[in-house]
Amino acid sequence: MATAEPAPAWWKLTFLRKKKSEPKVLYEIAGDHSSNGGEAPGTTDAATDSQFNARLERIVDKTATKGRHVKVSHSGRFKEKKRIRSTLAENPELFPEAETTANENNKSGK
């Protein structure tokens, strides 16, 4: 009987991936901005800090409003939240002026 060679580990090739050497950077690190070369302290620090703060605010603004209407279920699927609008008939106290004008229109039509 011939001995069978061990089967190649094909599943390792499909499921195990090589790690990428450099991860994707989504934002800049604050350490890069704080280390200014040999420039005079105080003159450019305020300008770079304000630019850096402006960039951070833009990043925060984008992420704050991005997924508010989407809910992730336990299975990992995204579900859109449906908003139910209330009509004026259900909430007449929202616009009391609309109620008085509607009553005046009905009186004049009679």
UniProtKB/Swiss-Prot annotation:
Start-end of Polar residues biased regions: 100-110
Give the InterPro entries listed for this entry: PRR15
Region: Disordered; residue ranges are 29-51, 65-110
Pfam assignment, any one = ATAD4
Composition bias of kind Basic residues appears in 65-85
Similarity comment:
Belongs to the PRR15 family.
Q: What is this protein called?
A: Proline-rich protein 15-like protein A
* Primary gene name: prr15la
